Amino acid sequence: MVQPLHDTSDPRNAGILINVNGTLTPRGEAMVSVFDSGFMLGDGIWEGMRVHGGRIAFLDRHLDRLFEGAKAIAMDVGLDRAGLEARLYETIDAN
């Protein structure tokens, strides 16, 4: 089997939970619908965030950029800042 170019096995990631629309899902079961606009059209925004000691470094700046990017492409994030922050920390705490 061909290994993807940027796929590096890391046993620390084997049991992680992925937050899919508010549901914590085992990594192997997490999926996005083929009808999702991010999949079909490539619509999307993302922020890479560093977690240290259970806290997200520079969270306010990350959220500023994320919401600005969403506005630029008319994307509804689906949560306000407080809701997204809560969901991020729920996911961190679960892992």
Q: What is the predicted role of each segment?
A:
Residues M1-N95:
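Conserved alpha/beta cores of soluble small-molecule-handling proteins
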